[in-house]
Regions:
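Conserved, mostly hydrophobic/aromatic
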Residues: 30, 54, 76, 108, ...
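Active-site loop/helix belt of alpha/beta enzymes
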Residues: 142-288, 351
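Structured core elements
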Residues: 71, 94, 114-116, 137-139, ...
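Generic secondary-structure signature for well-ordered alpha-helical cores
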Residues: 35, 39-43, 128-131, 173-181, ...
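Glycine-rich, aromatic-flanked loop segments that form ligand/cofactor-binding clefts
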Residues: 131-145
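Charged (often Lys/Glu-rich) extended helix/loop segments that serve as interaction or gating elements
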Residues: 258, 263-416
Length: 416
């Protein structure tokens, strides 16, 4: 059973000020996770977490993470702009993009961000649009399938990201000859893994690659970036990842592979988004309708506009009825109001018998929740609210208004 980070009584008070639906974030939980991550990798003096802005691009959240010693991982011009406006500078910014527009690459160089090249062809592209930096990273794709034990976790061969080993070695060789001084290796081989073994296994593969690359090219290896991929237990029956165990697993691989090769100064970087934020966000919504046809439908005032993952991926998010957490249950679909049949937060789910007006929370929406929102059916994006450590709430993004929707249109006068 998942428990919200806020009591029913306190949340009821908040809904008296802010109408549902809205996203609510827990500052205390965010800080706790950031500190646990840094403790887990404290054995590596150069460790740095680059929070993936794409997961939760709200300045208030990013400021909290900056205070906790995190950098940011950016993948677009506006994400770079957010980082700049918040005071992230130079190598506090990791720029991991693909099919990168010229203006984005140029801006990343202007900011002094560490650039993570996605393709071998980007070596020539970067030279053609900007000067080469002293430090650069290349993204590795091993191809094939990625396995943990007997489980297939993902299919890197199908991913559009990264370069082959041969391409990476060639890129390092050329970049070294062109004057680049220090190098990094980056890879993401699976997403949302709920396993303490993912990072250690990834680390083994990248550390072995690092040793081979250094031997063949003679480059100075500055860091290995494990990227993201460490997930959260969206289903309550799944055991959550233990970041302390994960950090120790990476340390053991580091001691076994890099240290004997004389690479004991290599820094470890991560680009966690989901792990850092997902458990510390709730989508708060009310039951607005109840319908009985071939199924029982609970209609809520949130929709896929507010949380796209279930509609796009069929992703599971646990849902709690705070007004009726226990008691008799029924099988329901919990749905929004979009004109799309995939606008469903839950399908055929056993759920407490609910009534119109009941207060529900959808769990683990702190990452890839608001950020994946859109405006289909001319729906307006909801507010974001921060539950501060003091227990007070702060509006960190207001809900959209109709005039926001019309603001970018020409030839239409909203005021008439």
């Amino acid at each position: 059973m998942k428990r919200p980070f806020i009591s029913r009584e306190r949340l009821k008070q908040i809904t008296e000020t802010y109408p549902t639906p809205f996203h609510l974030y827990d500052e205390a939980g965010i800080r706790q996770t950031a500190r646990a991550l840094h403790q887990a990798f404290s054995w590596n003096p150069g460790f740095k977490e680059y929070f993936a802005i794409k997961a939760t691009p709200n300045p208030a959240i990013l400021k909290i993470l900056k205070e906790e010693g995190c950098g940011v991982d950016c993948a677009s011009y506006v994400e770079l702009l957010i980082a700049q406006k918040l005071g992230f500078t130079g190598q506090e910014i990791m720029f991991s993009s693909n099919n990168t527009p010229v203006e984005e690459m140029v801006f990343a160089r202007q900011l002094g961000a560490t650039i993570n090249l996605d393709a071998y062809e980007d070596v020539a592209f970067l030279q053609s649009v900007a000067t080469l930096p002293e430090v650069i990273s290349c993204r590795y794709n091993p191809g094939g399938v990625f396995e943990l034990g007997t489980d297939i976790m993902d299919h890197p061969e199908e991913a559009k990201f990264g370069m082959t080993k041969e391409q990476l070695i060639q890129a390092f060789t050329e970049l070294k000859d062109l004057g680049v001084k220090r190098f990094g290796i980056h890879a993401l081989l699976a997403s949302n893994t709920v396993s303490n073994d993912y990072y250690p296994e990834l680390a083994k593969q990248l550390f072995q690659l690092a040793v081979e690359v250094v031997e063949k090219t003679g480059v100075t290896l500055d860091f290995v970036n494990l990227s993201g991929g460490v997930g959260v237990n969206y289903k309550p029956e799944d055991k959550p990842n233990d970041i302390a165990v994960i950090g120790e697993g990476v340390r053991q691989a580091y001691e076994d592979i890099l240290v004997p090769a004389g690479l004991d100064q290599v820094k470890i970087y991560t680009e966690l988004g989901r792990f850092m934020l997902a458990p510390h966000g709730l989508l708060v919504t009310h039951v607005t309708h109840k319908k009985q046809t071939y199924r029982t439908y609970l209609g809520v005032d949130a929709s896929a506009v507010n949380l796209l993952r279930p509609a796009m991926y069929g992703a599971y998010h646990h849902i709690t009825n705070l007004d009726r957490p226990d008691g008799e249950t029924e099988i329901v679909d919990i749905v929004g109001s979009l004109c799309e049949n995939n606008d469903k937060f839950a399908k055929n789910r056993e759920f407490p018998v609910s009534e119109i007006g009941d207060l529900l929370v959808i769990h683990d929406t702190g990452a890839h929740g608001y950020s994946m929102g859109y405006q289909y059916n001319a729906k307006l994006r909801s507010a974001e609210i921060l539950l501060e450590e003091s227990g007070q709430t702060r509006l960190i993004r207001r809900s959209e208004k109709p005039e926001d929707y019309f603001a970018t249109l020409y030839g239409f006068d909203f005021e008439k």
